[in-house]
Amino acid sequence: MVDTNILISALLASVSLPAHLIVLWREGRFDLLTSTDQLDELMRVTRYPKIRGRLSPTLAGRLINEVRDLAIMVTNLPSVDVCPDPNDNYLLAMASAGAADFLLTGDKRDLLGLKLFEGTKIISVRDFLVMHRRMP
């Protein structure tokens, strides 16, 4: 599964590791988990003035629709209170409910520091791509 910050980064920089990751997902190289919480966050963040000024609404809408329609929707998220940033606990709940192998994030301050949560490895996009020999 992929942290919302990775999805936003992919939208903002079409030539980047997050964008390459999204291409691999679209090619069916891995499954993507999502939840209504993540979709809500994605819609909210793409409307921030500092993001909206750098991002085409059409491009943002396309990715949101793709994630909603093609990702595996995880429901019945457990209550989780582990992350130093309480706003990220829903990502750990998604990982738990969806039995995710990986949680890919750029959050060095909070999520990457955890390294592992209930069997889910928490790593950077770069580490994931290197591990799977998918670097561009």
Which residue ranges define each predicted feature?
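Short secondary-structure boundary segments
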Residues: T4, T36-D37, G106-K108
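PIN-domain endoribonuclease scaffold, especially VapC-family toxins
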Residues: L24-P78
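Short, flexible helix/strand-to-coil boundary loops that buttress conserved ligand/catalytic motifs
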Residues: L11-L12, T46, K115, R133
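Short, well-structured N-terminal submotif of metal-dependent ribonuclease cores
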Residues: M1-T34
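Short, active-site-adjacent cap segments at secondary-structure transitions
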Residues: L7-I8, D40, D110-L112
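Hydrophobic/aromatic ligand-binding patch that stacks against planar heteroaromatic rings
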Residues: L24, M94, L114
